[in-house]
Curated annotation (Swiss-Prot):
It catalyses: 2 superoxide + 2 H(+) = H2O2 + O2. This is Superoxide dismutase [Cu-Zn]. The modification N6-acetyllysine is found at K122, K136. It is found in: Cytoplasm; Nucleus. The modification N6-succinyllysine is found at K4, K10, K91, K122, K136. Binds 1 copper ion per subunit. Binds 1 zinc ion per subunit. PROSITE patterns: SOD_CU_ZN_1, SOD_CU_ZN_2. Destroys radicals which are normally produced within the cells and which are toxic to biological systems. Its cofactor is Cu cation; Zn(2+). Disulfide bonds join C57-C146. Keywords: Acetylation, Antioxidant, Copper, Cytoplasm, Disulfide bond, Lipoprotein, Metal-binding, Nucleus, Oxidoreductase, Palmitate, Phosphoprotein, Zinc. The lineage of its organism: Eukaryota, Metazoa, Chordata, Craniata, Vertebrata. Palmitoylation helps nuclear targeting and decreases catalytic activity. Succinylation, adjacent to copper catalytic site, probably inhibits activity. Desuccinylation by SIRT5 enhances activity.
Length: 153
């Protein structure tokens, strides 16, 4: 069973980063890392369905959602498995990621291994935007950078 994973984020522009995933205890996955080249502010941060980046980040498909739920925030009961909320970049364009999540997993039905991590252009409205797109994507906009999540030591 995997206890650690890593993802290298790259895109067509300057946004890049490395994200680490580590199982802590039985269910909690600690997500850490750094993303550079972002505009200042919040950016949607999600695990997408497929580990396919052949057409850039768009071929990664929708948010990872094995339970067919509506989009939500990371603390919501009603959320996609892949909904990790937002990362926040400072004036220097760097976002330091620190998320503890008990919905994603590194094995089993909620495993994110082999799926794509995506950082988006806009803030995720956490499903509270009042329109249909909000319940699917959080109105987070285009995909700035992505990478496939793989097992590591």
């Amino acid at each position: 069973m995997a206890t650690k994973a890593v993802c290298v984020l790259k895109g067509d522009g300057p946004v890049q980063g490395t994200i680490y995933f580590e199982l802590k205890g039985e269910k909690t996955v600690l997500v850490t890392g750094t993303i550079k080249g972002l505009a200042e502010g919040d950016h949607g941060f999600h695990v997408h369905q497929f580990g396919d980046n052949t057409q850039g980040c768009t071929s990664a498909g929708p948010h990872f959602n094995p339970e067919s739920k509506k989009h939500g925030g990371p603390k919501d009961q009603e959320r996609h498995v892949g909904d990790l909320g937002n990362v926040t970049a400072g004036k220097d364009g760097v976002a330091t990621v620190y998320i503890e999540d008990s919905v994603i997993a590194l094995s089993g039905d909620h495993s994110i291994i082999g799926r794509t991590m995506v950082v988006h252009e806009k803030p995720d409205d956490l499903g509270r935007g009042g329109n249909e797109e909000s319940t699917k994507t959080g109105n987070a906009g285009s995909r700035l950078a992505c990478g496939v999540i793989g097992i590591t030591q």
